[in-house]
Amino acid sequence: MEKIQRYLQLKRSQQHDFLYPLIFQEYIYVFAHNRALNRSILSENPGYDNKSSLRIVKRLITRMYQQNHFLISSNDSNQNRFWARNKNLYSEIISEGFAFIVEIPFSLQLISCLERKKNKIIKSQNLRSIHSIFPFLEDNFSHLNFVLDILIPHSVHVEILIQTLRYWVKDVSSLHLLRVFLNQYCSLITSKKVSSSLSKRNQRFFFFLYNSHVCEYESIFVFLRNQSFHLRSTSSGVLLERIYFYIKIERLVNVFVKDFRANLWLVEEPCMHYIRYQGKSILASKGTSLFMNKWKFYLVTSWEWHFLVWFHPRRICINQFSRHSLEIFGYLSNVQTDPSVVRSQILENAFLINNAIRKLDTLVPIIPLIAKLAKEKFCNVLGHPSSKPIWADLSDSNIIDRFGRICRNISHYHSGSSKKKSLYRIKYILRLSCARTLARKHKSTVRVFLKRLGSELLEEFLMSEEDVLFLTFQKTSSALRRVYRSRIWYLDMISINDLANYKSKF
């Protein structure tokens, strides 16, 4: 990375970032295809790292610019095993390296921005962190009235993406090469089915395109939000996942103050909160239904006129939070009203005070979890445990370790649930499925197998983190034990993506 930074520092004197020559550098592909950083289908091909050289890169780019550069005959694929994995392997190799290169100016600009504002930004790690959602759910969400559940539009024209990236990447040759990639993958951007299949093989490239695309959506939202807040609040900087965010927010503020100074204090708008996760975003407010319809109109209009994206209004749902549940991070969240009766007595007069406390319930979606377990052959569709025949050839310790890892991942991910008793059924299914798999391997019944080895064998491996904490702090006060039995949001839960998307594997 130091070599790359020295290269960009040299070119910065010319007021341009010439990234195109970096494509021909071999160490770029060492970074892009590092097994520890990006485990893609290319890195699984044995001998690929040794073949990523300047000669191959030049040949690939030359063939990409030919007339029929994406057509590979079956005979050529059989003769060369290196190209047999994928017909579009030419462009995939270059696009992954290209995605790594164009991220460099973004990263350097963000670092320089944070260095200049290190005295003003206390928690700079929250600038691009999803962890800020957890305290938001605990503290503020239960006090909101309406929620806009938005499906972010994914259909966009190729040239719109090019125009967006021109503000960040000044190298014309790199943009021309990007246009070649986007013309090939235009069907991936408009077709969700094809995009989900091929984006897994080139995650870095598609993540970069998606984030740069959504980045512009959120910039419009920041402008509208600051308008309703009279430019007095920049708390959205903690929630918005933005690159180079604070410099852009200053420019928006300066333009708005200059042109609309007379209208700043006319209308007082209620508080707005914004969350983005996966392909959805959420706008929540204490305002009225009319206020939320205004925001819906603003968003649809900006997408259609500024980004030339036809967006159906039905993709934005306005829900009253007290009557509808919200699906977020694999949880079903809704607001429950808990009555609380307080008895007060003043001298000889006693009276009761009824208070209604709004609390956010984060529930575990048991039905989708059981459906996922049934798809993976741990149980049937009704939730009755069954053996896992494909694991019967493994060793006993390996079988128990696999079942225990799945059980611990589910407990770890759903530790923020307000009603953890619903997880007992999932643990029961996994525990009994593990016992039946072991009994199938030893050609015995579950009762005989557990009687011979003891049920403690499974309990030791399937013990939840809550039980471990309780055993660790047995001698502490009861108040501390109650803390560990309450909702706990583990910050590494976002790495368990499979539980947030039940279409994936565990």
From Swiss-Prot:
GO cellular component, one term: chloroplast
Protein name: Maturase K
Function description: Usually encoded in the trnK tRNA gene intron. Probably assists in splicing its own and other chloroplast group II introns.
GO BP, sorted A to Z: mRNA processing; RNA splicing; tRNA processing
Chain's gene name: matK
Keywords in alphabetical order: Chloroplast, mRNA processing, Plastid, RNA-binding, tRNA processing
Source organism of this protein record: Ocimum basilicum
Molecular function (Gene Ontology), one example: RNA binding
Family the entry assigns: Belongs to the intron maturase 2 family. MatK subfamily.
PANTHER family: MATURASE K
Pfam families tied to this protein: Intron_maturas2, MatK_N
Cellular compartment(s): Plastid, Chloroplast
